[in-house]
């Protein structure tokens, strides 16, 4: 094992370019966090006038974008913050990162030359102002490409066929439909685009000073890659746009090296020239790595701007909901993923409206209301939802004759409003009943062996208690809620090790036998409660899914 150890005194730097912020996490050779940094887009870069890191276009239904240059300037700023704190970049031997999934960046012709000849005396932002053919990047919250989704699915033989090829049916936020929209509506702009990157490969390109490959895991969120063969799918490419393969470049495994760090960073910040840049990947795959999720039967729930449920499987099973991606740290398995758009921002909206803008009041309401909420069920969508595919709106129901023992004779009555405490519980119960129902439908284990919760809301023990009650299992948390940038730093160490050995090394070799002494250790937060409660929640879940299916039939936007 000696040749698989990390050099003492070496550091591993992980970034997370997410929807609302950019984070940096530094791990030492014992895999302990020694430094973190944060740039919050709205407050640290107010000149871009974003709200929650995005622009919501009121003139085009569902169009949600972020200014590409803001991400560049955020990178300038986070590196400057590390430098101002006297961080020793020379000790960093590998860098990797995480990008919000599906978002795309469009480089104009000649930009590769600009990347290769960056002047270390000037900021990245100054030098890349004219590098993009599209100034505003479509992101995962965008739902303006329903037409393109249908066109792509029809071209390959239907939704299930596309899911078999790429791991997912067509989703509006996926990169393929977004590229098709550009191709169909702004053909000249598409033609003038030299390279199309994902947020992850875009950030890696800045670091290596040239176009970086898209990694195979993040590529599975594009509706363009053959998930079994790990190469671009000819059928999917042809269904999307002409001349696309050339604009996408090559694919690479997530654990591969993208290249050595560019001279720009060596001269400007003092990185060592041999520092390797490991392929960046998506935020959820990085969270999977950061949570050391490696056992089929474990589930992770990431609670952030989006909520995501993910797990691991050895089998490739296509489905019409959810997604299958290559596991970023194990070429022999897959990660399965369900994504919900109405997450922390929806929780905050109800906190502000019903709980005096206070989490303390919100939590008090959760504590003083009964499990099952006396049969009150709510559906709350402040954005067009992905799963289920429902438009903005709220729907509230009271179940009549619900004893908790069976659904016989139980009818739902739609109502206009709930009292504030019931509204708070209906939101949280509803969000997690929905997650349990969809994970079961997707073939994930029920009950799970355990759930690992991460993301901002995982710090809320009242929410964790409800998750435990609804799913009927123990709930663990990690020491820090920012598992994506932690996972990126861990993947930097893993990629460095694979590069040193010249072949794939299991990531568990990094922490086997010493997980408890690292920043990766999970802690038990809530023990599984009464199995009868979980079983009664199962009944409530079935009723909720009946109502959900009716809503989708009546209102479904896809």
UniProtKB/Swiss-Prot annotation:
Q: Which residues are in coiled coils?
A: none
One Pfam family cited in the UniProt record for this chain: FGGY_N
Cross-referenced SUPFAM superfamilies, in alphabetical order?
Answer: Actin-like ATPase domain
Phenotype upon gene inactivation? Impaired xylulose kinase activity in cytoplasm. Hypersensitivity to D-xylulose (Xyl) leading to reduced seeds germination. Loss of remediation of photosynthetic pigments after oxo-clomazone-mediated bleaching, thus leading to albino plants.
Activity's thermal dependence: Optimum temperature is 40 degrees Celsius (at pH 8). Active from 10 to 50 degrees Celsius.
- Annotated control of activity: Repressed by oxo-clomazone (keto-clomazone), a bleaching herbicide.
Protein's name in the database: Xylulose kinase 2
Q: Which organism is it from?
A: Arabidopsis thaliana (Mouse-ear cress)
Q: What is the lineage of its organism?
A: Eukaryota, Viridiplantae, Streptophyta, Embryophyta, Tracheophyta
């Amino acid at each position: 094992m000696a040749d698989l150890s990390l050099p003492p005194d070496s550091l591993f730097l992980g970034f997370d370019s997410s929807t609302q912020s950019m984070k940096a996490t530094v791990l030492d050779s014992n895999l302990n966090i020694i430094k973190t940094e944060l740039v919050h887009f709205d407050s640290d870069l107010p000149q871009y006038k974003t709200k929650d890191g995005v622009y919501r276009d009121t003139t085009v239904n569902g169009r949600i974008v972020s200014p590409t240059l803001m991400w560049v300037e955020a990178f300038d700023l986070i590196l400057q913050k590390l430098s101002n704190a006297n961080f020793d970049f020379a000790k960093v031997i590998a860098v990797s990162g995480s990008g919000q999934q599906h978002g795309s960046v469009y480089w104009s012709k000649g930009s590769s030359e600009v990347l290769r000849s960056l002047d270390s005396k000037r900021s990245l932002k100054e030098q890349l102002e004219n590098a993009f053919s599209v100034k505003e990047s479509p992101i995962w919250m965008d739902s303006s490409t329903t037409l393109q989704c249908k066109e792509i699915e029809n071209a390959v033989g239907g939704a299930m066929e596309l899911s078999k090829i790429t791991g997912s049916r067509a989703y509006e936020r996926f990169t393929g439909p977004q590229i098709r929209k550009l191709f169909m509506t702004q053909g000249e702009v598409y033609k003038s685009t030299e390279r199309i990157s994902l947020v992850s490969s875009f950030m890696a390109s800045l670091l290596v000073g040239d176009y970086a490959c898209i990694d195979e895991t993040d590529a599975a969120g594009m509706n363009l890659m053959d998930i079994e063969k790990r190469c671009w799918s000819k059928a999917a490419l042809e269904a999307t746009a002409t001349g696309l393969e050339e604009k996408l470049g090559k694919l690479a495994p997530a654990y591969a090296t993208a290249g050595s760090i560019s001279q720009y960073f060596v001269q400007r910040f003092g990185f060592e020239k041999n520092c390797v840049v490991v392929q960046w990947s998506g935020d959820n795959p990085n969270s999977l790595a950061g949570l050391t999720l490696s056992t089929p039967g474990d589930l992770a729930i990431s609670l952030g701007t989006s909520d995501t449920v993910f797990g691991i499987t050895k089998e490739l099973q296509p489905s019409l909901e959810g997604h299958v991606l290559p596991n970023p740290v194990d070429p022999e398995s897959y990660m399965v993923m369900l994504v919900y758009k109405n997450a922390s921002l929806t929780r905050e909206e109800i906190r502000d409206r019903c709980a005096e803008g206070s989490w303390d009041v919100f939590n008090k309401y959760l504590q003083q209301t009964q499990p099952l909420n006396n049969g009150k069920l709510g559906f709350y969508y402040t954005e067009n939802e992905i799963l289920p595919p429902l438009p903005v709106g709220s729907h509230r129901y009271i179940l009549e004759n619900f004893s908790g023992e069976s659904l016989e004779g139980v009818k739902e009555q739609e109502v206009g409003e709930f009292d504030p405490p019931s509204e708070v519980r209906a939101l949280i119960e509803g969000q997690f009943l929905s997650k349990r129902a969809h994970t079961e439908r997707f073939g994930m284990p029920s009950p799970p062996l355990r759930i690992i919760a991460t993301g901002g809301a995982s710090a809320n023990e009242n929410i964790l208690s409800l998750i435990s009650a609804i799913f009927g299992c123990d709930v663990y948390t990690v020491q820090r809620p920012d598992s994506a940038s932690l996972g990126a730093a861990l993947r930097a160490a893993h990629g460095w090790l694979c590069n040193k050995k010249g072949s794939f090394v299991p990531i568990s070799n990094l922490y086997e036998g010493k997980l408890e002494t690292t920043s990766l250790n999970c802690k038990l937060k809530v023990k599984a409660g009464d199995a009868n409660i979980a079983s009664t929640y199962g009944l409530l879940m079935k009723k909720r899914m009946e109502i959900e299916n009716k809503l989708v039939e009546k209102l479904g936007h896809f």
